[in-house]
Amino acid sequence: SIDEALLLGHRIVVIENGLVKAQYQVPETAGERNLLDDWFISLKRDIINNLNITE
């Protein structure tokens, strides 16, 4: 899931037809990541748009 990738990953890659469509760097943060933070919400929306799916 996108949320799991945001919580656990440091880099998220969107692949379409075997090609890299988009890459995202998730900064290493001290403490826990907050998916309700504006930065994470914006990143999730961008990933969803690149996947051509609706929220």
Task: Explain the meaning of each model-derived region.
Residues N49, I53-E55:
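Short secondary-structure subsegments characteristic of cysteine-rich extracellular domains
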Residues V14-I48:
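Conserved beta-strand-loop-alpha-helix hinge in the C-terminal portion
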Residues A5-L7:
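A short, surface-exposed alpha-helical micro-motif characterized by mixed small hydrophobic
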